[in-house]
Curated annotation (Swiss-Prot):
Homodimer. Keywords: Chaperone, Cytoplasm, Stress response. GO terms for biological process: protein folding. This is Protein GrpE. The lineage of its organism: Bacteria, Pseudomonadati, Campylobacterota, Epsilonproteobacteria, Campylobacterales. Residues 1-19, 29-42 have a biased composition (Basic and acidic residues). GO terms for molecular function: adenyl-nucleotide exchange factor activity; protein homodimerization activity; protein-folding chaperone binding; unfolded protein binding. It comes from Helicobacter pylori (strain HPAG1). It is found in: Cytoplasm.
Length: 191
């Protein structure tokens, strides 16, 4: 019986190293698997971080583009509102010219007539309203300025030097500093 017991014990002790070896091998394999898993996790993490950075950069660019478009639209809207009167002002210029022509004609006949005074008051009121909305006549003093004046003809003038404005043929107007229509003038040429 002792022999049997010894044999069994020997048999167990022989098995133990084998199972121990298997356990060690299993642990090594698990260690390798953990290392591989850890490496894969690192790769996945690096890939994720790279993609995150790319997406974040794209987001920042798109956001910046959006802000630029938003600012441009606000500026365009502001400009459109600021110059909204420009078209109607251009349409009114021939009416103003006709009123001015009627006034000049009536003033030549009789400067003190009710018609002349009525036209004069109408012109004054019209110019007040236009000025309130940023529309004003271009001054045509002595100096010719190609930014504001359009020289239609050159005339001899003993009273004016070369290049000076002699006569205003058609009043020019500007809207908030921008020329709507240049003044049509004649300038002196004494050569």
């Amino acid at each position: 019986m002792k022999d049997e017991h010894n044999q069994e014990h020997d048999h167990l002790s022989q098995k133990e190293p084998e199972s121990y070896q298997k356990a060690c091998a299993c642990k090594e394999q698990q260690g390798e698997e953990k290392q591989e898993a850890s490496e894969k996790e690192c790769e996945i993490k690096e890939d994720f971080e790279l993609k995150y950075k790319e997406m974040h950069e794209k987001y920042l660019r798109v956001h910046a583009d959006f802000e630029n478009v938003k600012k441009r639209l606000e500026r365009d809207k502001s400009m459109a509102l600021e110059y909204a009167y420009e078209k109607i002002a251009l349409d009114l210029l021939p009416v103003i010219d006709a009123l001015l022509g009627a006034y000049k004609s009536a003033a030549e006949e009789n400067k003190e007539s009710a018609l002349t005074k009525g036209l004069e008051l109408t012109m004054e009121k019209l110019h007040e309203v236009l000025a309130r909305h940023g529309i004003e006549g271009i001054e045509c003093l002595e100096e010719f300025d190609p930014n504001f004046h359009n020289a239609i003809m050159q005339v001899k003038s003993e009273e004016k030097e070369n290049g000076k404005i002699v006569q205003v043929l058609q009043q020019g107007y500007k809207y908030k500093g921008r020329v709507l229509r240049p003044a049509m003038v004649s300038i002196a040429k004494n050569d």
